[in-house]
Amino acid sequence: MEYEFRRNSLTGTYLASFSMDHEVLGQWFSEELGPELAKIQQVLDIIKEIQAGKRDSWRLIGGDLTLDLDEEQARIYANALGFEQEYELEESMSLYDAESEAYCGLEDLEEALLSWYEFVQKGR
């Protein structure tokens, strides 16, 4: 999983971009976490608790995206994916979930979060 972090010097916004099949992680980092060090640290602390066996799983529901953690992996997905459709769409009209959902290993997420934390901290 590859990623790149940038900061817009004019607006001060932080942006994360992740490799194909993990694009939604970039959106989650940029929009749900943003430059909030306390929120980043909270997720890192929860990961440590899961790795230590103190928790089995954890969920953080954001404005547009949700993070689910368990002992093996992280899943980030658009909140809209959690809703059941009342009717079936034709095959050609099916919703494209690949950019709305991603899975990665817990350690991979932890590594990316640590890098994001450092990047945001240096930008202050």
Swiss-Prot record:
- Pfam families recorded for this chain? UPF0231
Family note: Belongs to the UPF0231 family.
- What HAMAP family does this protein's entry cite? UPF0231
The name on file for this protein is UPF0231 protein Shewana3_0655
User: Which organism encodes this protein?
Assistant: Shewanella sp. (strain ANA-3)
Taxonomic lineage is: Bacteria, Pseudomonadati, Pseudomonadota, Gammaproteobacteria, Alteromonadales
